[in-house]
Amino acid sequence: MKQEIKLSKEQQEIIDSNKDTIVVSNPGTGKTTTLSLKVIKLLEDKINPEDILCITFTEKAKKEMFDAIYDYGKGKFSDADIMKINIHTFHSFAYNYLLDAGIISGDIVGNNLMRFSILNSFEQNQALNYGKDYIISTIVPKTENSIRYIKSFGITPDKIDLNKATTILEKIFDEKSSSYTIDEMKSFLKYFIEAYKEYEKSKLQAVDYSDMLLMFKEKFRGNKFQHVLVDEMQDMNEIEAEIATMVAENLFLVGDAKQAIFGFQG
């Protein structure tokens, strides 16, 4: 059992609050501890542990969160009750729901398929006047990151209008601060869309991690959790923020004061 922590008046008020709560402070100031103690307070208030969902972003952070909750709760609650608390990454939460609902088969596309599809598309279209080594080491990773980024907003290749995208590029492009010319960027934009299409086609019926979040958002028909707690909430993208709000009756978010804070309606 962890040593009793002396909380400030403000920390105690945060943990005792029954309202949607956002805790923002500098890194290393005990936000995850606050989240863990909030879970313990919910258990003390007789909240069903199965009605508590804790979300973080990596398997390592998930284990650390469980360990902290277990240590603070040891001696107060049974191991069985603590084990009933739902602790997930966003992806494992979406995966488990979709799998249990029979929406996916369990096959998840890995990173290698995306990289191969991007490279294959560039080669087939004889895209970009660069050496293959440079394309593999620099262009493919940038394309991969760009696909993941726009997909996090629910933008699939069929929703991208090349003419509109080109017009926007011309308006925002600053040649002085870019390593590429406007013509190179226009060519890349065209081939980027083709590579994105090639990747989606190559997956066939399989899904990747971004697909899982999109599918969860569209297919979720389950009951809301009474309490949803999110660690490192500044790392949430738009879809993850929507998922957190759609599955929660009450939200408790903790994060660093370095990025935009999400607003919640209601």
Please describe what each predicted stretch is.
Residues 39, 57-60, 89-92, 254-258, ...:
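A short beta-strand-to-loop transition that corresponds to the Sensor-1 phosphate-sensing loop
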Residues 48-51, 83, 249-250, 256-257:
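Short glycine-/polar-rich loops that comprise or flank the Walker A/P-loop
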Residues 13, 41-45, 72, 218-219:
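A generic secondary-structure signal
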Residues 1-24, 29, 33-34, 51-53, ...:
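Accessory N-terminal region flanking or inserted into the helicase ATPase core
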Residues 30-37, 59, 64:
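Phosphate-binding Walker
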Residues 33-47, 247:
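Walker A/P-loop NTP-binding motif
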Residues 51-146:
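Conserved P-loop NTPase-based nucleic-acid remodeling module centered on helicase motor cores
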Residues 29-31, 234-266:
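Conserved helicase motor core of SF1/SF2 NTP-dependent helicases
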